Amino acid sequence: FLFIGDGMGATHVAVTESYLSHKAGKLGGEQLQISQFPYYGTATTHSANRHITCSSAAGTAIACGEKANNGTVGINKDSVEIESVAYALKKDGYRIGIMSTVPINHATPASFYAHSFNRGNYYEISSQIPASGFDLFAGAGFLDHKDKAGDKEATDAYLEKNGYVVSYGIEEFKAESEGAEKVVFCQASNRNESADNYVSDGVEEEDATMAQMLELALDFLGDEQPFFIMGEGGAIDWAAHDNRTMSMVENVIDFDNAVKVAYKFYLEHPDET
């Protein structure tokens, strides 16, 4: 498992834990799961060409092991396409799952399967999914569902033509993923196609939490082969950009709940995880 809290730092964690402590009637002491692990580390986060990174440069650095220029996806500072850890593991026989709480072709998840000089080329990025051969993608649909010229087929139709079962919502995914080789899970409402929609704005019951998405991924990927799952809490950053503190807190909690699912899996499979 690799979990990325997009835009999340120590302050986001501290604010969330303060909220949880207040909710429990305490002055402090409530901890997220991510605060309870025995080891911590810090890292510099500047990109190859900016003091302040962006999600695509940071995602590329995490996924591919090289610093990149802001705005680029899966391309190093010398303009060379570089391979992500997900591709390396796929070659070694791992099943691969890429999931996010924001659109699947957004910067961080894209860094694990795509190459682009412009993180905003959303249609081009999602069109690279079939070439990856990855087994599962999950998130809040896709940005730019059609190409900018409007003369190419919609992303979901393109993916289905190229071997992926595309489903919307939990129940549809459960029904249609049975027996499928490669799947794409999209939120039923695709609410995160706009950064104006957050948990506290009202969530439709049919939309999955990050923990639920991870449980779907674990059920689909199974235990017959080793697997790798990258899970991004992308809406943490979106809420923070808009100064929506409560939405940020809710999304950190959502992220942490997914980590709890993974940690439970580890406790049940300590030798393999």
Where are these regions (language model features)?
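N-terminal catalytic scaffold of extracellular/periplasmic and nuclease hydrolases
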Residues: 1-148, 153-177, 181
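Active-site regions of oxyanion-processing enzymes, predominantly non-cytosolic
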Residues: 169, 173-186, 213-233
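Beta-strand elements within well-structured catalytic alpha/beta cores of enzymes
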Residues: 1-8, 89, 186, 227-234, ...
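Generic, well-ordered alpha-helical scaffold segments in large soluble proteins
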Residues: 92, 216-220, 258-265
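Phosphate/oxyanion-binding active-site loops and adjacent basic polyanion-contact surfaces
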Residues: 118, 206-214, 251-255
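Active-site His/acidic residue clusters
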Residues: 107-112, 189-202, 225-226, 230-263
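Metal-dependent active-site segment of extracytoplasmic phospho-/sulfohydrolases and closely related
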Residues: 10, 254-273
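Accessory "access/gating" subregions that flank catalytic or transport cores
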Residues: 201-225, 236-237, 271
